[in-house]
């Protein structure tokens, strides 16, 4: 991932914490009761796990479906590569066919008309508070992240070519909706909705 995606796109980040500059990390907090506590696990080195690492088997130690340490700006560049079906600024990362396959549901989480999972990406059904984006053919695509107090989302509309990237930490749950959904809708309503 680091060589074939991150470096090719000119981004800074990766799954292996020991290969990154800790001075560039944001402090991540969890909310515990009435206070915020700095997360101890967010940037824990996995070096002690490496002697027993088996390619293709031990990969969960790096959180391969997420777990990448990256800035919001660089995550937006990565999202734009997916929005352009595998290409960004003339740099092809994956074939258009593979990119479209990644954005096509292959696993039914619930039933038709509810969120569906593709290959590391998913359709967001009933997520955006705009009836248009709750209609088949208009569902936004993306990925959320949540661990150690971090909450992030990259979500875009293949139909209308808009996208949102957001990262927060130490949130308090909002009654009735997931925090990221509320944040995404606030950004959508302020910046995208006509």
What function would you assign to each model-found segment?
Residues 68, 82, 147-149, 170-173:
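Solvent-exposed loop/turn segments at secondary-structure junctions
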Residues 151-170:
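Short, well-ordered beta-strand elements
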């Amino acid at each position: 991932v680091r060589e074939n995606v991150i470096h090719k796109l000119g981004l800074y980040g990766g799954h292996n914490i020991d290969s990154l500059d800790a001075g560039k990390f944001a402090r991540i907090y969890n909310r515990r009761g009435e206070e915020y506590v700095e997360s101890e696990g967010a940037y824990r080195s996995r070096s002690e796990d490496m002697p027993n690492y088996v390619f293709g088997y031990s990969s969960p130690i790096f959180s391969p479906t997420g777990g990448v340490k990256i800035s919001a700006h660089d995550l937006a560049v990565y999202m734009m590569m997916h929005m352009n079906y595998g290409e960004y600024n003339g740099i092809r990362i994956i074939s258009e066919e593979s990119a479209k396959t990644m954005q096509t549901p292959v696993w039914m989480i619930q039933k038709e008309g509810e969120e569906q999972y593709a290959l590391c990406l998913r359709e967001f059904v009933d997520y955006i508070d705009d009836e248009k984006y709750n209609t088949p053919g208009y569902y936004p695509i993306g990925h959320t992240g949540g661990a150690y107090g971090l909450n992030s989302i990259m979500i875009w509309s293949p139909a209308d070519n808009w996208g949102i990237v957001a990262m927060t930490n130490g949130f308090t749950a909002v009654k009735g909706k997931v925090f990221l959904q509320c944040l995404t809708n606030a950004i959508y309503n302020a910046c995208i909705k006509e």
